[in-house]
Amino acid sequence: MKRKSFENAECPLARSLEAIGDTWSVLIVRQAFAGDRRFGEFEKSLGVAKNILTVRLRKLVALGILEQVPVEGSAHHEYALTEKGRGLNLVLMAIRQWGEGCGGDTPYVLVDKRDRKPVKPLAFHAHDGRELAAEDMELVPAEEFSRAARRK
């Protein structure tokens, strides 16, 4: 059975998972945030097979998450996060935060570079500053929201 593509799905979550939903792609992006730039660095830090790494890097470049940057004075290139790729930082940190809450050791603490203090956990906040739990929120059709906002 052929795998269904969600590349053009209406749902932004489905489209996002189509782009970065496999484990290797997410870990490659994580390593790019950690400073890996060269093929060999990704290969070594992740322990991933070359053929898998090649396919995932090509996909991330094609999606505009990574870009190939020439290495000055060399025929080689490096991989760098694009603006679109850097936008995944919040997503990765949210997944990390969820994983921390599921138990197990946490070898790293996320800190503010300026003062080295731990960063507050991610949370959703209402327009008035209240922290919102999952049961405090709902998705409504954008068209319905627009009509309701115009009536106010």
Regions found by a protein language model. Give the residues of each.
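Canonical helix-turn-helix DNA-binding module
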Residues: 39, 43-68, 75
